[in-house]
Each structure stands twice: as structure tokens, then as C-alpha cells.
Amino acid sequence: MKLNDLSPAPGSRREKHRPGRGIGSGLGKTGGRGHKGQTSRSGGTIAPGFEGGQQPLHRRLPKFGFVSLKAMDRAEVRLSELAKVEGDIVTVQTLKDANVINVNVQRVKIMLSGEVTRAVTIGKGIGATKGARSAIEAAGGKFEE
């Protein structure tokens, strides 16, 4: 037996629909599209959100909110995530290399969540909450100013 000899068991798979191939197929002539009208024509699809001429929902509701540009280049890091960084010095670049933060992030702040397992030196440009700072210093770590 070879791979080209293999075929599914008879009746285990349904035949694909072939519209417009005779009355007996059940999809002949109009091909399941019905008679006349926009959707019976080729290219006759209705745009997403179109509601037949009435004011669409996305235009009936008011605009709100915005996307903060600050949120795109800032990130919060938990104490427990510092363990993923190889080496003793934690910088923005080492956090990126360890896939802790996104490559677009420029400013980082460490939050008190989890535990510090080893002494680490936090590089310049990385902020920390009071609780996170005291936890890092209690574990023997320090901050570069």
C-alpha cells in the first residue's frame, strides 16, 4: 500500500456543492440564490453595517474615548517578572530581550506584585512604586540613579 492508494471510506465524506450543475443537484439554475434581487447578482453583497437605508447603529451612537499615545510606549512590570531577566542588571533593553515588555516600550515602572527571588540592580530610566522599591532593596538589590 502506498500513500496514493489511500482514499476515504465510501460515504464518509460529503461531496462539495457545485451550484449551477443541473436540477437534480438541488442547486441548479439559480444556484441557491433565489430569483432576482441584489444578492442574486454577482458582486451583490451588502456592506457590513448597512441596515437598508436606516441610520446604522455605529452612526446612531455617540463617539467616546480615545487611544492614549502614552499607553503605547509605557509598561508596568511585576516584581515576579524580574526573574525572567538574565543577569543582575535590569534595564529597558534586558526586559525587551526577555520578552517581558513590547519592543515599542520606552518607559517602565515596576509594581509590587509577586516576590523578588534574587538581588538585582535596576538601571536608569526604570521607575518603581514605593513598595516595589523597598522589596527590591530588602532582597539586596539597588537602584542606579
Swiss-Prot record:
It comes from the Bacteria. The keyword Ribonucleoprotein applies. InterPro entries: Ribosomal_uL15, Ribosomal_uL15/eL18, Ribosomal_uL15/eL18_sf, Ribosomal_uL15_bac-type. Residues 1-57 are annotated as: Disordered. The keyword Ribonucleoprotein applies. GO terms for molecular function: rRNA binding; structural constituent of ribosome. Part of the 50S ribosomal subunit. Binds to the 23S rRNA. Belongs to the universal ribosomal protein uL15 family. This is Large ribosomal subunit protein uL15.
